[in-house]
UniProtKB/Swiss-Prot annotation:
One of its GO terms (cellular component) is cytoplasm. It comes from the Bacteria. S-adenosyl-L-methionine binds at A34, G35, H36, D53, F80, D101, Q108. It comes from Mycoplasma mobile (strain ATCC 43663 / 163K / NCTC 11711) (Mesomycoplasma mobile). This is Ribosomal RNA small subunit methyltransferase H. Its main location: cytoplasm. Its EC number is 2.1.1.199. It is an enzyme of class 2 (transferase).
């Protein structure tokens, strides 16, 4: 059974960074269970909240939650990379705040049937969007050893990716999450297993591949700033070093000073970036926030 309890990560930091006005237009590109969106909607009684999620169950659940607060929201079952098309459909050109939480929601992890957790028995799945065909079962049982090696390194920077790819291909068919987890622990050297459960990184790599997460993020970032109003902000919460490097590089490209230091006139600053980490209190109350980092890009008013 799926738990609907989800504690939004860095909620206070999101609200503080956005400092929303009552007429603002806000986009939550990773709606989830509307943990962030519920609180943002309360801040914009005369504005508009736009929520997007790949997971239909997230849309259904969030709609009921948000309706208890107001009616000034629109929800879409879609990939966040489609935001430009959705805004055109809504005839909106600029927004005041954009939130992207790249973490998987607690209900998805806790629902054994979704196949995201290496601690719960389930058919290998890991699809955010249950309408798509590609799932973890197909990847684990059909990809070549070379393909598996590449995705394990590309999506989770697993150093012994070739060794793990060989273990997987040598033990097919692999049907379930726990079966894969047991195989990894059985055939990898004991010192590796003792140091860190190898399933964590392998499951991350598979999930990223199934949902095309890196490509979707890169595509999204291309046009994100163009839809920001002046003083608008983009907040992106990441949970691993690969995502964070992508976001850091993207945000950094807007604050890099291309004007030589010795010139008498410097280019006026157009953007600023701030970084936030979970507080000690949040870490104690929600251990899943441990690896979270939020970067916020602000478009400065000219």
């Amino acid at each position: 059974m799926e738990s609907n309890v989800h504690i939004p990560i860095l909620l206070n930091e999101v609200l503080s960074a956005f400092n929303l006005k009552e007429t603002d237009v806000v986009i939550d590109l990773t709606l989830g269970r509307a943990g962030h969106s519920q609180e943002m909607l309360k801040k914009i009684p005369k504005g508009l909240l736009i929520g997007i999620d790949k997971d239909k169950s997230a849309i259904t659940f969030s709609k009921e939650k948000l309706e208890q607060i107001g009616s000034n929201f629109k929800l879409f079952h879609s990939d966040f990379s489609k935001i430009s098309d959705l805004l055109k459909e809504l005839k909106i050109s600029k927004v005041n705040a954009i939130l992207i939480d790249l973490g998987i929601s607690s209900p998805q992890i806790d629902n054994a049937n979704r196949g995201f957790s290496y601690n719960k028995e389930s058919r290998l799945d890991m699809r955010m969007n249950l309408d798509q065909k590609l799932d973890a079962h197909f990847i684990v049982n059909s990809y070549s050893e070379e393909q598996l090696k590449n995705l394990l390194y590309r999506n989770a920077e697993i150093k012994n990716s070739r060794q793990i790819a060989k273990i997987i291909t040598s033990n097919r068919p692999i049907e379930t999450t726990l079966q894969l987890s047991v195989i990894l622990k059985k055939y990898l050297p004991a010192f590796i297993v003792r140091k860190k459960d190898p399933s964590k990184a392998v499951f991350q790599a598979l999930r990223v591949e199934v949902n095309d997460e890196i490509n979707s993020l890169n595509f999204l970032l291309k046009n994100l700033v163009s839809i920001l109003e002046e003083n608008g902000k983009v907040a992106i919460i990441t949970f691993n070093s690969i995502e964070d490097r992508i976001v850091k590089k993207y945000f950094g490209s807007f604050i890099k000073d291309d004007v030589l230091a010795f010139l008498p006139t410097k280019k006026e600053k157009e953007f600023e970036v701030k970084t936030y980490l979970p507080s000690k209190k949040e870490l104690e109350e929600n251990p899943r926030s441990k690896s979270a980092k939020m970067r916020v890009l602000k478009k400065i008013e000219r």
